[in-house]
């Protein structure tokens, strides 16, 4: 089930994340998250959805003895969100200063500076591995940066905005933060937040509890359920943040 919360930052800007209840159950394949609210008609908008920051790892592949491709090392990422979505009225670089982007970690360039990578020998190597990490995340539909995808309507003398995000099944349970920024003259002048809490339900929740408390029983039930359903239940439980 997805629980929704909204916070109004001021009388001008509001943010509400709103969609049907989502249960991560046995047949869950993702959903949609819409974000809407009221905004200043003279301001550009940036909408960001992120998970809490965490540690993630990306495995390095290389040839061993000049013959076989194998894992030859691991790049560790610190302070990185498992999910990062960004939507804006225009390209972020065109409407927000570098300092403002860095302060609120808006955009891939700011995220790259914010994230710590180990081991890397210099900024050039960091940029290469961060780029590979973003490609992996985008392929998994966990990272997305897009512009021009916010629509506006006028009602009762107010400007209403709306955008829609495809919510990937790979996103793990937890609390996600939706932040809406109002931007003028390349500075953030207002912001509003919503929280989206995603939870497991039904058999998935029970099996997840078994996986934690009784791995042997979980393994047997997972195989039986997979044979009955035609796909591996284990796929449902894989963490969206893990990179292989």
What are these regions (language model features)?
Residues 6-8:
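N-terminal signal peptide c-region/cleavage motif recognized by signal peptidases
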Residues 11-28:
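N-terminal edge beta-strand
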Residues 29-35:
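Structural beta-strand segments of beta-rich domains
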Residues 35-68:
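N-terminal, post-signal-peptide region of Sec/Tat-exported proteins
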Residues 70-170:
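Membrane-proximal low-complexity regions enriched in glycine and acidic/polar residues
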Residues 161, 174-180:
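A short tyrosine-centered beta-strand micro-motif
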Residues 187-220:
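Short, aromatic-rich amphipathic segments at membrane interfaces
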Residues 214-244:
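Juxtamembrane interface at the cytosolic side of transmembrane helices
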């Amino acid at each position: 089930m997805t629980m929704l919360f909204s916070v109004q930052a001021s009388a001008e800007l509001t943010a509400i994340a709103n969609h049907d209840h989502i249960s991560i159950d046995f047949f869950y394949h993702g959903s949609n998250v819409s974000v809407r609210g009221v905004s200043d008609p003279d301001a550009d908008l940036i909408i960001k959805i992120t998970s809490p920051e965490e540690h993630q790892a990306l495995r390095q592949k290389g040839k061993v003895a000049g013959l076989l491709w194998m894992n030859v090392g691991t790049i560790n990422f610190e302070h990185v969100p498992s999910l990062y979505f960004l939507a804006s009225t225009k390209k972020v670089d065109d409407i927000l200063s570098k300092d403002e982007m860095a302060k609120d970690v808006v955009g891939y360039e700011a995220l790259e500076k914010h994230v710590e990578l180990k081991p890397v020998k210099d900024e050039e190597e960091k940029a290469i591995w961060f780029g590979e990490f973003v490609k992996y995340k985008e392929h998994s539909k966990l990272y997305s940066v897009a512009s021009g995808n916010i629509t506006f309507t006028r009602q009762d003398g107010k400007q209403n905005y709306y955008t829609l995000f495809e919510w990937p099944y790979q996103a793990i349970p937890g609390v996600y933060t939706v932040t809406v920024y109002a931007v003028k003259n390349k500075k953030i002048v207002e912001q509003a937040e919503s929280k989206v809490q995603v939870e497991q339900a039904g058999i998935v929740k029970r099996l997840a509890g078994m996986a934690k408390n009784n791995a042997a029983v979980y393994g047997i039930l997972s195989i039986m359920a997979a044979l009955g359903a035609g796909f591996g239940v284990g796929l449902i439980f894989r963490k969206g943040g893990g990179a292989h």
